[in-house]
C-alpha cells in the first residue's frame, strides 16, 4: 500500500502553513531571483529555511539575515555546486545535522544559455546541461535518500516554459533540452517515489530576475509582444506556487508541472 497520506488539516490556512517544516532552496543568493522569493514565501509561512549559493556568499548571508529578521525563523546559507553530486550530498547531510530534517527541497539553481548549438561551444552545451539537468538529478538523488528514510518529503523542481516550447528569437537549445528533461524527471520521480515523496515542477516564463539583462532590448520587446499579458513576470508572483507544492495543501499533487508564463504557451 502507498505510504503517503492525505493532509490531516481541514483549514486551508493550516494546510498551507509550513511551521515546523524545514525547506531547502538552491540558488537563492540573489536579491530578487526566484530562489530567494521561494525562500521568502516559505519563511513567511513559518518554515525554517536553508538556502544555497555557488559563488555569491555575501549575497546569501545578506538574504539569511533578511529572512531571520523579517520572518523570525531560522535560516542558514550553504555553499553548494549542484553540478557535483558530492556537493549536493554534503548539503543534505549538513542541513539534516543543523536542522534535524528536510521536509521540502526546491531544486532551483540553474544556468542560462546564450547561443544555439552551431554558434555555441561543446563546453557551453555541457555546462548548461550539467548544471540544469544533471544538477537537478544530483539534488534529487541526494535528498531522495533522506525522504525515503523519513517516509515523507516534497521535491519541487524549477523547470521552465522553455521545456515546453522552443523560444524565439533567441537561440538556447541546450537550455530548452535541459528544462524539458527536468519536467520529465519530475514526472518520472513522482512515480518512482510514490510511496514516500511527492515530486512536482514549476515552469516559469519570462521572469524579471536580472539574468536576461544581456538580451538586447529589441529582442525583449519582441518576446513581450508574444506574451498575452504583455510583460515579464515578477519573481514574487511565483511564491504561492512554491509554498503550495512544499505544503500539506498539495498532498494529492504529484507529477504535476505548473506553467506560470503570462499565457505565452497558449499562443
Curated annotation (Swiss-Prot):
The active site is at 160 (proton donor), 175 (proton acceptor), 179 (lowers pka of active site tyr). One of its GO terms (biological process) is protein homotetramerization. Pfam families: adh_short_C2. One of its GO terms (molecular function) is mannitol 2-dehydrogenase (NADP+) activity. It catalyses: D-mannitol + NADP(+) = D-fructose + NADPH + H(+). InterPro entries: NAD(P)-bd_dom_sf, SDR_fam. The keyword Oxidoreductase applies. The keyword Signal does not apply. NADP(+) binds at residues 108, 141, 175, 179, 207, 209. It comes from the Eukaryota. Its EC number is 1.1.1.138. Keywords: Allergen, NADP, Oxidoreductase. Interconverts D-mannitol and D-fructose. Not active with fructose 6-phosphate or NADH. Belongs to the short-chain dehydrogenases/reductases (SDR) family. Exists as monomer, dimer and tetramer. This is NADP-dependent mannitol dehydrogenase. It comes from Davidiella tassiana.
